[in-house]
Structure formats: structure tokens, C-alpha cells
From Swiss-Prot:
Family indicated by similarity: Belongs to the class-II aminoacyl-tRNA synthetase family. Type-1 seryl-tRNA synthetase subfamily.
UniProt keywords, alphabetically: Aminoacyl-tRNA synthetase, ATP-binding, Cytoplasm, Ligase, Nucleotide-binding, Protein biosynthesis
Lineage, highest ranks first: Bacteria, Pseudomonadati, Pseudomonadota, Gammaproteobacteria, Alteromonadales
Catalytic activity: tRNA(Ser) + L-serine + ATP = L-seryl-tRNA(Ser) + AMP + diphosphate + H(+); tRNA(Sec) + L-serine + ATP = L-seryl-tRNA(Sec) + AMP + diphosphate + H(+)
Gene Ontology molecular function terms on file: ATP binding; serine-tRNA ligase activity
Main location: cytoplasm
Protein name: Serine--tRNA ligase
Swiss-Prot/TrEMBL GO biological process terms: selenocysteine biosynthetic process; seryl-tRNA aminoacylation
Domain of life: Bacteria
């Protein structure tokens, strides 16, 4: 959520910056609402003051033995007018809040301006795609050939965009998650968390999935015994970031760095026909998430660090990748700046996203009222929040199967994972 004061005082600037994201802000309507809000605020305060003044005169009139019926009627009339104005004001504030909640974050000045993914800017590459001297297979053919990926059973059990993994490929998938967690907790300073896979509406509002992206989520029915509907998490960013919702942490506790390995669930609304085969776009997938909560002045440097943490996973696994900075028109709703890390997939002969690392600045913190106490003046200030995949486990599995495949259909285990695989060097 954007800063309401900045929005009021810099409406034209806000509209101009949001336009680079493809979001058209109705400046005239917001200006009209703001004028109405001010007018109603003044009217409410004047009616309140008038009612208070007349109410005081009732006691004085009674002391003089005067009839107070007329004054009482006047107080009642002012009270009715006041209640009506308060309702009008509340309606205006509710509309302004609804508009504010629908606005994406302002892009950072360092984010390249562009309309869509074709205008993202590559910032670096690591590794060289392998040259094969045999006809390569994609991860689907490899996984099915090794009896490790069972798409047919998943369709029978649930439906499309799900997977059943078996044997050593299931073990490899588990090993990847453990390897990522160990790397981030032992070398990168993150604290591991086990979090709920179901979250409430307030949590989704806090991180920005609601109210705009409810169709992308899976929602539970019936409600819990508390009468509350819940939703499956689309990413562990939601529960991890909401750990500081409605709280004030000490400045000395910062930065807070959290990680979790969870299943994630997405309806993939609007993705009909995209990546219908394989593991690239599933309704249920595993991901190791990285979240940082930092002071505002540290957040841009933290974005670089967090992105490097995600890249380190690919480097340790020997997987070629490139990192791109997203243009304004391709960034996620709550992001002010985002790096996408794209891994090389020989089966598709292209780079595909495997991690998205974003600085949300105070956009989520304002929604969540997540603050820290500044030592200099002992006053609370909004945190900056960052998140990124470190990494998407299923897509990393895809990359290993395709990049480490052999001519006979077997797959070599990357050295970094062999201790997690009981010393196994090859599948198949």
C-alpha cells in the first residue's frame, strides 16, 4: 500500500510513475474524493464542536431553572446531522482505501522503464550451456524413462498440473530442498521456519495477494471452527512476512532473515495453454523461500545480497543461468524492483525463470503495520520487506535432469547433492 500522504501531496507524480507499470490512476476521481473528504472532515468537526458547546449549556440552563427541551432537541438534531456526516465520511474513506489497496507499488528509479518482458534487461550470466553429442531429451521423457515422474497417476488421483514422483527422483527432489535450506541457514545467515500452509485473509491482504489476486488462490470450504475461511499459500513469503504483522521489533534485531521449504499452491488462472506438459507450471510445487526484513536505508543493498544467495544455489549445482532486472511493466504487484534468475533448460533450448527476488520497500509493511523502533528517537518506523525463491525446487529438478542427462537416459547427480543421496552418483 502506498503512503497516503505521498499520494495526496504528489498525486501527479504518483500517476506518472504508476503509468510506467501500465496502471492508469484516475487522478480526477481521486482529487474529487480528496476534496469531498476534506469538506466532510471540516463539517464533521464543526458539528462536533457545535454539539459539544450546546451540550455544555444544558447544565448551565438547568442550574438557572430554565426549560432545556429546546436545547435538548437542538443537540439531538446536531447529533443526527453528525451521524449522517460520519457515515458519508466513512464511505469516502472506504472508497479511497479500496483504490489505494488496488494500486501497485511505485517502481524504484533504478528499474528500467518498459511495457513487458521483452524489455527486461540482462545484467549477468554464469556458466556455459553444455554441448551434447547425442540427441537430448526433455525432463518429461527423462523422468518417465527413469520411472520417476508419473503424470498419469497424478491425473487419475487429482487432475492436470500435478505430479507423482517415485524412487530416486523423489529422493533427488527431497535432497534439493534439504541442500537449499542447509546452504541458506549455515552460510547465508537465515533462520529456518516451519509455517502453516493455510493462511487467513489478513495475511494475504498484508502481503498483497488480496484483494486483487484472489482468483489465483485455492480457498478452503467450509470455514474453520472459528468461522474463518482460509487459503492455501501461493508462496511461503505470505506466512514468513506476516510473522511481523502488527508488531514493532527493535532496531538491533534487524536484519531479520527467514527461510522455509514448503509446498506452494496456485490456480494458475490466466495460464491456460501455457506449459501444459511437465513440471514447469504446476498447481502444487515445492519452493524454498527467502525473506528479509530490514531498515529502509538497507533494502536496496539487501536485494543484491538476497539475489546473490539464490544464485549461489545454481552455482553450487553447476547450472548455467542468467539474471535479468525486470522492467516496470513486468514487475509483480508489490515490487519496487525485481531480479529474475533464469536457468538454462536444454530441453527447451532457452532460459526459464527459477527465482524472482524483489524489494517491496514499505509497501507490505504499511499494509501489515510491521514496524521497528528507531534507536535515534525511539519512534516506530515502517520496515522494508524483501523476498525471493531460493529456489523453486521442481524447476531446479527439471534443470538437473536436462543438464546432467547422459546418452543412455541416465542422469548424473551433481557433486553438491551426493551426500544427500547416500553417495549415489547417477540415477539410471
Amino acid at each position: 500500500m502506498l503512503d497516503p500522504k505521498f499520494l495526496r501531496n504528489e498525486l501527479a507524480v504518483t500517476a506518472e510513475r504508476l503509468a510506467t507499470r501500465g496502471f492508469i490512476l484516475d487522478v480526477a476521481h481521486l482529487t474529487q474524493l480528496e476534496e469531498k473528504r476534506k469538506s466532510l472532515q471540516v463539517a464533521t468537526e464543526e458539528l462536533q464542536a457545535a454539539r459539544n458547546a450546546i451540550s455544555k449549556s444544558i447544565g448551565q440552563a438547568k442550574a438557572r431553572g430554565e426549560d432545556v427541551d429546546a436545547i435538548m432537541a437542538q443537540v439531538g438534531d446536531l447529533g443526527s446531522q453528525l451521524d449522517a456526516k460520519k457515515l458519508e465520511l466513512a464511505a469516502v474513506l472506504e472508497e479511497v482505501n479500496a483504490i489505494a489497496m488496488s494500486m501497485p507499488n511505485l517502481p524504484d528509479e533504478s528499474a528500467p522503464i518498459g511495457a513487458d518482458e521483452t524489455q527486461n534487461v540482462e545484467v549477468r550470466r554464469w556458466g556455459t550451456p553444455r554441448s551434447f553429442d547425442f540427441p537430448i531429451k526433455d525432463h518429461i521423457d527423462l523422468g518417465e524413462g527413469l520411472n520417476g515422474l508419473d503424470f498419469k497417476s497424478a491425473v487419475k488421483i487429482t487432475g492436470s498440473r500435478f505430479i507423482v514422483m517415485k524412487g530416486q527422483i523423489a529422493r533427488l527432489n527431497r535432497a534439493l530442498g534439504q541442500f537449499m535450506l542447509d546452504l541458506h541457514t549455515t552460510e547465508h545467515g537465515y533462520t529456518e521456519a516451519y509455517v502453516p500452509l493455510l493462511v487467513n485473509e489478513a495475511s494475504l491482504l498484508g502481503t498483497g495477494q488480496l484483494p486483487k489476486f484472489g482468483e489465483d488462490l485455492f480457498h478452503t470450504k467450509p470455514a474453520t471452527e472459528e468461522g474463518q475461511g482460509l487459503s492455501l499459500i501461493p508462496t511461503a513469503e505470505v506466512p514468513l512476512t506476516n510473522l511481523v504483522r502488527d508488531s514493532i521489533v527493535d532496531e538491533d534485531e534487524l536484519p531479520i532473515k527467514l527461510t522455509a521449504h514448503t509446498a506452494c499452491f496456485r490456480s494458475e488462472a490466466g495460464s491456460y495453454g501455457k506449459d501444459t506438459r511437465g513440471l514447469i507450471r504446476q498447481h502444487q510445487f515445492d519452493k524454498v523461500e527467502l525473506v528479509q526484513l530490514v531498515k529502509p536505508e538497507d533494502s536496496m543493498a539487501a536485494l543484491e545480497t538476497l539475489t546473490n544467495h539464490a544464485e549461489t544455489v545454481l552455482q553450487r549445482l553447476g547450472l548455467p543461468y542468467r539474471t535479468v532486472v525486470l522492467c516496470t511493466g513486468d514487475m509483480g504487484f508489490g515490487s519496487s524492483k525485481t531480479y529474475d534468475i533464469e536457468v538454462w533448460l536444454p530441453g527447451q533450448n532457452t532460459y526459464r525463470e527459477i527465482s524472482s527476488c524483489s524489494n517491496m520497500k514499505d509497501f507490505q509493511a504499511r499494509r501489515m503495520q510491521a514496524r521497528y523502533r528507531v534507536k535515534a528517537d525511539n519512534k516506530p518506523a515502517l520496515l522494508h520487506t524483501l523476498n525471493g525463491s531460493g529456489l523453486a525446487v521442481g524447476r531446479t529438478l527439471v534443470a538437473i535432469l536436462e543438464n546432467y542427462q547422459n546418452a543412455d537416459g541416465s542422469v548424473t547427480i551433481p557433486e553438491a547433492l551426493r551426500s544427500y543421496m547416500g553417495g549415489l552418483t547417477q540415477i539410471g
